[in-house]
Structures are given as C-alpha cells and as structure tokens.
C-alpha cells in the first residue's frame, strides 16, 4: 500500500515489509518515510487544520457517521486485515473492527456536542448582571502515534475525536501494522473528509516519530505504547499538549468471598486475549494464601 501525504497516495523506493506473524509471509509493503515526507505532511496538515476548523460540527458529524457506516459494511474485510497483519485470531479481528465502528460513530456524535461554558461574573465588584463565556476551539495539527496491538481501533481512538473537534491529524501507525490505518484513511476520504484533513505516514518510529513530536507545527500529540517511548516523547514535545496511554502492570485482586470459577475464567480471558498483548491484560493476581 502507499502512504497518504499532502493529498496524494505516494510510494517510495525504500520499503518496509509487512509480515503475517503466523508464518512470516509478506502481506504487503509500505513506503519508508523520511524527513522530507514529514515536512510535506506537516505543511499540508497546517493548511488542513484551517479547513477542518471551518467545518461546522454538523459537517464533521456527517463525515464521521458516513465513515462508520462504510466501516460497518466492510467489517469482515477489516477484521481479516487486522488478523493478518497483527496476528490475533479472526474472532478478535472481527471484534476489533466492530469496536472501531463504535469508536468512530461515538466521535461523530460528540462533534455535535462541543460547547463552552457560561460563567456568572457577580463574584467580583461590578460583575452583577454580567456573564462571561468560554468556547472550545481546535488545537490545530494533532500527531497520532499508535501501537501494533490494536491497529485499527486505537487509531480510531485518536483520529475520531481529533477530527470531531475540528483538527487535522497526522497519523503515524506502528511500523509492524500500518495497513489498517491506511485503510481507515481511505475510508475517511471516501466519506468526504477534506484531503488535507488527514495524513498517514509509514516508517520507522525512531526516524520520523521524533521529527513529528519536536516540530512546532504540531500542537498536540496522542500516543499509545510503552512507558519508555512515552517519556521520550514528553521530553521532545516541549510545551505541546500530550495524551499518553502507556503500558501498565495490571493486577487482579481476588477477595476471600470471590466466585473462583468466575475469577478463573476472567483471568484466563484477560490474560491470554491477543496473546497477552493488551495494555490492561491481567499480569498479576493478588490474593490470600488460602485462595492461592
């Protein structure tokens, strides 16, 4: 597949092979972006941010709602793609595709509900009978860096709200699983998203991720991944707004009166789903010696 930069699907001589984790077969290749591609993407996103900010909430709702409908129609194909590039079983791939539809539809609904606040000013002399008000406005350019374990839904978690709020988004999907993000980009454009409202850069996180996070044209960074990388991004980001969803060490606490059959089933399901590659998977069980 090609990456999407400055309103065009482009290819590059340098490639990254996308492998099926089951047998290491090559599913597809994607371009390996460089510094020049990052600069083009951000220049386009700056223009796109102005376009997106001018769209009414209703128009953003309409685009995202249409995208969710297209995703629902293609649920099986998306589920198959997730399974092939990430390695999860097909049932989990289909479930993720369905969750992604809900994520985009929820974002669409929120596009109609972005409002400010009215504040009485009578707490100060001369403020009697006066009101102040606030408005929520878009950040501008949002860099969305996603992990490998949920290659569609976690991209939607970042892209959907950002577009709903009137921002332009530069997506940097995980190097191992970029295809679902590229397919989502296709669907959003088909749904009517302005061409410069989204960019999708494929490549090495170390090579292009730092460039994205350090660039002053980026106003917000949203990242899901490891604690080490999250700390690095925060150091590079400077005064940008950041949202970090980092790895955890999730315990289950089993109390003496717990239903152990239910607990055992839940621990097995949450510990081994997606081969344990979930940030909130069960990693420890804390209980009393008797239950142990």
What is each stretch, according to the model?
Residues 131-132, 199-219:
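A structured beta-alpha segment of the ubiquitous adenosine-cofactor-binding alpha/beta core
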Residues 160, 219-224:
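Periplasmic-binding protein-like
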Residues 228-292:
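ALDH superfamily catalytic-core signature
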Residues 24, 60, 82, 104, ...:
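Residue-level signal for inorganic ion chemistry
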Residues 159-160, 209, 230, 264:
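Generic hydrophobic/aromatic pocket-lining and core-packing "Φ" positions
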Residues 1-29, 62, 66, 114-143, ...:
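Terminal low-complexity tails and localization/encapsulation signals of metabolic enzymes
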